[in-house]
Amino acid sequence: MVILGTQSATTREQFANWGWRIPFLLSMILVSISFYIRLRMRESPIFSRIKASGMTSAKPLTEAFTVWPNLKRVLISLFGAAAGQGVICYTAQFYALFYLQTILKVNPKTSNIIVALALLLGMPFFTLFGALSDRIGRKWLMMAACLLSILSYIPIYKQMQVAAGNNIVTVRSTTNKLTGAINLTPFTTDATGQQVPAEEASNPNIPMLVFLLFVQTIFACMIYGPIAAYLVEAFPARIRYTSLSLPYHIGNGVFGGLLPLIGLTLCARTGNIYAGLYYPMIVAAITLVAGSLLLKETYGTLIWDEYNQANQTSPTAD
């Protein structure tokens, strides 16, 4: 919304020259608020009780990543949940925006409006699927998101092309010799059947495009809603924060964060406008297989029982 507002307040040239810096500057407000909240946050009751009882880990990094049972949980959580969550969420937001602007030649302002509307419509479903996972479980809801993404990404993006109104048949790439940046030029066919550079989409079907992005947002909600509860329930409190940080941040920062670059590279190398989707589909497939076989259902786990059980078995419990 901030980017959209900035684009509306500036011309295209102004935004390209200096306007793009405004959202980054405004983000300092959010950083300040987040920092303030973090300073005032208290530890969870269970961790406070464990800390008071002297049951915390002296070396959480060592215990989390060198003790095999804990490392096994980390790896299963990464490949069986977080990696798929990362690419599914990034596809719904960032890759969809790249596809609209770069491949389908939809006006940047219009593209941002489409993405913003889809995200606004999808926001309540993050809570809905989180609550649903409290009733039916986490694992298979997350696996369903992976399966639906694998099966539907190509059809969805084909329909996005139809809705945009540009008959894009291929893309060609050029590389800036100075910076190494890859630029994509989409091509369509003219009346004689010759391939020509595509013009900006003149009359995109905005409601249909919003709906198609909303569907992708639903997939993201299906896996993102339950994953926070799953990660908390998957690790013991004494090393929980350290342990869940690795799969979550690698899943989002690496697997998800590399999606735009890998998607762009695949399209550039192949000329196939759908090739960029192969990467999130493959990662989602890995998560589907690994999660289905190895992920334990944590629904119903009473995380405070960990303290009670440890306290009962402690020689100083009496």
Regions found by a protein language model. Name each.
Residues 34-41, 156-163, 282-309:
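Multi-pass alpha-helical transporter architecture, strongest
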Residues 154-211:
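Low-complexity, proline/glycine-enriched hydrophobic segments characteristic of transmembrane helices
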Residues 222-235:
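Intracellular juxtamembrane helix-capping segments at the cytosolic ends
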Residues 234, 238-270:
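A late C-terminal transmembrane helix in Major Facilitator Superfamily
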